[in-house]
Amino acid sequence: MEPEILSIELIKPSSPTPRHLKTHKLCFLDQYRNHAYFPMVFFYSVTHDTNLNLSNETDIAQIVSVRLQLLKQSLPETLSLFYPFAGKIKDNLSIDCSDEGIYFTEARFKSPLKEFFNQQNFSCLTYKFVPFDAKELEGSISGLHVAKIQVTSFACGGIVICACLSHLFADGATLCSFLKCWVATACKNNEQRISPNNDASWLFPQNEAYPKEGTWLAMCPRFFGHGRFVTRRFVFDAKAIATIKAKASSSTRVQNPTPTRVEAVSALFSKCVMAAFKAKHGSHKTTLLTHSVNLRNKAKSILSEYSMGNIVWNANALCTNEEAELDLEGLVCKLREAMMKINGDFVKSLLGDEGFLNLCQAIKDENGVCSKAKERINFSSWCNFGLYDIDFGWGKPMWVSVIGLDGKLPYFSSTIILLDTRFGDGIEAWVYLLEEDMNTLELDKELLALATLDPCPLW
């Protein structure tokens, strides 16, 4: 199954961006990031239109056409608020907001959506919905689009929307804010329209003295492998998460004995992936557990929920050789201790005249921790983002995903992305590992007793 590309166009904001906003300066938190598109993928069924004959191809084509037009017609007004999304990357420090337009692709599969889910390892095939390829991660970034969207229709009338954003510009929370604004615009719900906040550019002003060795890629290149990275999706229901929580809070060792579902699942994967690393090396190697922390939640009096940019920082927990046999409770302790350090005081330390110096110290500290580790596991949680509320008027998505990367990228790092399940009480874990490590992880009895590997999201 391969999609047919029907059209590619640039959709411009409904009103021109003011002259003084034509250049969007990245903040120094953005300077830590490298360019890479990260996608959010939304799968929608056709079944909410009960007044149409779904056995009639003409009616199905009409449904798709109406929905597609709604998406396209509501984008310009959304882009007038989120104007950098219609821009291009100028260099490592700025976005050219000359309103060239957001990159918008229409594609089509001639088969019904259920056939996509009937394929073996269908989660690994979600890359077919993205409007970019691996070549855009190489070479010059100048002139690349900040954001891209692809809408793919199926013969049954189902639609898949993939929205991608450059990590050089902003994080997942920013993309989620854009999507919520797009939904409110499409549904003519002005009360729910989000106005983004550009406070990060002056709270954390960019600095040309930012160390070149202080970017995500440059700091620890040995953690970015050039082998074959593969993707697997592990799904935990509410019962499984309750079991993990119970195992991770079986004594009074933890001050707050009940871990969150994100802490519990992160601890489980830390244990299981480190066991896979041990099987490869023959012994435990010091491993760095890195969890992205949303700074907006840590300093609500300073930052808006809708602040644009990479308003995140890494919480790092080092598991040394002496800590090779930590149980789930011990791993929850380590992760929580690391994440608690990324707090309101940390955000305040980045403000004012000393802010950049304190950032440089934080980079130096992370570099020091990285130098002690032989392996690294990166965690990013998109739970509680409200992604299943992205409803353009024809119903909530039946599935929200990221993408599979089996052999598709020139380099990558061991990464686990956590998402809500459709009903909000479970977690989907998208795991990206070198194939050798994944082969071991897929045999982990403790993990398989708790998670289901790549279940179909249709039921």
From Swiss-Prot:
Task: Mention one GO molecular function.
Answer: acyltransferase activity
- Protein name, UniProt field: Limonoid 7-O-acetyltransferse
E.C. number, please? Answer: 2.1.1.-
The protein's role, per its UniProt record? Acetyltransferase involved in the biosynthesis of limonoids triterpene natural products such as limonin, a compound with insecticidal activity responsible for the bitter taste in citrus. Catalyzes the formation of (1S)-1,7-diacetoxy-luvungin A from (1S)-1-acetoxy-luvungin A.
Tissue specificity annotation: Expressed in maturing fruits and in juice vesicles.
Q: Which family does the UniProt entry place this protein in?
A: Belongs to the plant acyltransferase family.
Which InterPro entries does this UniProt record tie to the protein?
Answer: CAT-like_dom_sf
Establish whether keyword Acyltransferase is in the entry. Answer: yes
Sorted keywords for this record are: Acyltransferase, Transferase
List the active-site residues: 167 (proton acceptor), 391 (proton acceptor)
Pathway listed: Secondary metabolite biosynthesis; terpenoid biosynthesis
Indicate the enzyme's highest-level EC class: transferase
Q: Which Pfam family is one of those matched by this entry? A: Transferase
Domain of life, per lineage: Eukaryota
On subunit structure and binding partners, the annotation says: Monomer.
Reaction catalysed?
(1S)-1-acetoxy-luvungin A + acetyl-CoA = (1S)-1,7-diacetoxy-luvungin A + CoA
